[in-house]
Swiss-Prot record:
Keyword Lyase annotated: yes
Signal peptide stretch: none
Similarity comment: Belongs to the DapA family.
Protein name according to UniProt: Probable 5-dehydro-4-deoxyglucarate dehydratase
One GO molecular-function entry: 4-hydroxy-tetrahydrodipicolinate synthase activity
Catalyzed reactions: 5-dehydro-4-deoxy-D-glucarate + H(+) = 2,5-dioxopentanoate + CO2 + H2O
Alphabetized NCBIfam families for the sequence: KdgD, PRK03620.1
Taxonomic lineage from the root: Bacteria, Pseudomonadati, Pseudomonadota, Alphaproteobacteria, Hyphomicrobiales
Length: 314
């Protein structure tokens, strides 16, 4: 069980960079525990404020409800209290509660509640869903505002009153007006996380709206670049930020946007590039082509910080 209160967890993750480690698979798509343990231990060596086990980049949508707590338990064992471990949960309310309870028992310090599966509902229904998950556990819960689960400011305010362990809000839609209204309504009651794909692109403008942290997928394979970029964001170092966007993030996005599902696949490919092969993505996602991996390799090799990452993998 976690030793952190929901408020302590929220304060901690709001103070630094976050990431969602990939979930390694073997050639037969079974979970590769040894590689996952090695990756988690390696990532903890960098300046990261929280790691989300079995999150979106960790292919939560392709994991079974029993796999999630197993993966969380391993993450907790390998991080050894160095950073908070948060777990993904989602689908319908009953399954989300089941996964949440299992993750809490496995030692998770918090939860990220992903949108319900292919279900559109009114605010009252979304609120009931969030409240049910919050009531099932004592650890902190972060809601992910995205796609078919967009909570409005008034709904969030009501939930914040009823659910003491609702401590975070992750934005995955990029609606500047909505983000502003949410922050204006709830202020410091929640910790705010930037959660758009390749969140580095939006990090600086979001910082000015009270969003002090974001989830970096590229931290998986270029952790030094990711942490240096985050430091530049917090310092509002425009020159360093725009250089990082121009030289790495935007070219990476160009590869990512070629096919649906590549937001996860390109991160797995990046792990292969630096010598930390974490296997294939599970269907229905598809892996990058050899040509695309070659392009990504060339892009990664241009980063000075990648040398130490490659050496660490050897």
């Amino acid at each position: 069980m976690s030793k952190m209160t929901p408020q302590e967890m929220a304060q901690t993750i709001g103070s630094g960079l976050l990431s969602f480690p990939v979930t390694p698979f073997k050639a037969d798509y079974s979970f590769d525990e040894a590689t996952y343990r090695a990756n988690m231990d390696w990532l903890c060596g960098y300046d990261v404020a929280g790691l989300f086990a079995a999150g979106g980049t960790g292919e939560f949508f392709s994991l079974t409800p029993t796999e999630v707590p197993q993966i969380v338990k391993i993450a907790v064992e390998e991080t050894k209290g160095r950073v908070p471990v948060l777990a993904g949960t989602g689908y319908g309310t009953a399954i989300a509660r089941e996964i949440a309870v299992g993750a809490e028992k496995a030692g998770a310090d918090g939860l990220l509640l992903l949108p319900p599966y292919l279900t559109h509902s009114e605010q009252d229904g979304l609120a009931a869903h969030v409240e049910a998950v919050c009531a099932a556990v004592k650890i902190g819960v972060i809601v992910y505002n995205r796609d078919n689960a967009i909570l409005q400011p008034d709904t969030l305010a009501r939930l914040a009153e009823r659910c003491p362990n609702l401590v975070g809000y992750k934005d995955g839609i990029g609606d500047i007006e909505l983000m502003t209204r949410v922050y204006t309504k709830l202020g410091d009651r929640l910790t705010y996380i930037g959660g758009l794909p390749t969140a580095e692109t939006f990090a600086l403008p979001y910082l000015d709206m009270g969003v002090t942290t974001y989830s970096s997928a590229v931290f998986n394979f270029v952790p030094e670049f990711a942490t240096n970029f985050y430091a530049a964001v917090r310092k509002r170092d425009h020159a360093t930020i725009h250089a990082g966007l121009k030289d790495f993030i935007l070219p990476l996005i160009a590869i990512r946007n070629r096919k649906k599902g590549y937001a996860v696949s390109i991160i797995k490919a990046g792990m292969k590039v630096i010598g930390r092969d974490s296997g294939p993505v599970r269907p229905p996602l598809t892996d990058l082509t050899e040509q695309e991996i070659a392009e990504l390799t060339a892009l990664v090799k241009k980063l000075p910080a990648i040398r130490s990452s490659q050496q660490a993998a050897e």
